[in-house]
């Protein structure tokens, strides 16, 4: 059962961030520029996935709660092999009949940790969010057919480092599918569990997609958003595991009869 907590909070003012180089300090605007139903709220939620596992989901518009979850994700990433340090990312948009469309919800996933950040309900950006999205070395963001997502994020004042981003649809194909544009559900059903073939049918695309601006988000949309980010993360992890395993097998096969290679 989810428990929501919310309170009204005023927008934060612009502030100067110091620069140790002695140059003029940058003016940083922490206010979220996207119009919407502003509400400071947090909904923690356990979301069931296949094999009776649970996702630990935090849906929030509160910058401190978002920062806490981002720090937890960074800690998880720090304990991983560098090859597998990735963050699953997905974006939901404002209504297409009210242009210009912008990002309304940003979802991030690392293992079972999921952040569903409700941008249009927020008044202030989390301090950890932009540094996370612009990280240059430590991890890679993984999305699915995400060119549009990146554009909507940029319109909303956020940008993912283009040098640390992978579009999974351009890196993998579902065997025997044959279609040029394959879906996330098809990827997830092939790589994770067959039940994900129906994952996009859990909500009414016409009616429920108009509710992303409602604060707080209803639980069914939180679950939908969390699973999108999770299957993106999990599918890419399996792809990377297979690619790494095949690469190591090729190397091992080339040295199969070499006792010095195996250390005996």
Regions found by a protein language model. Give the residues of each.
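Generic macromolecular interface patches on structured domains
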Residues: 198, 242-245
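N-terminal accessory regions of nucleic-acid-interacting proteins
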Residues: 1-85, 122, 168, 237, ...
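Conserved DEDDh/DEDDy metal-dependent 3′-5′ exonuclease domain
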Residues: 58-70, 84-87, 93-238
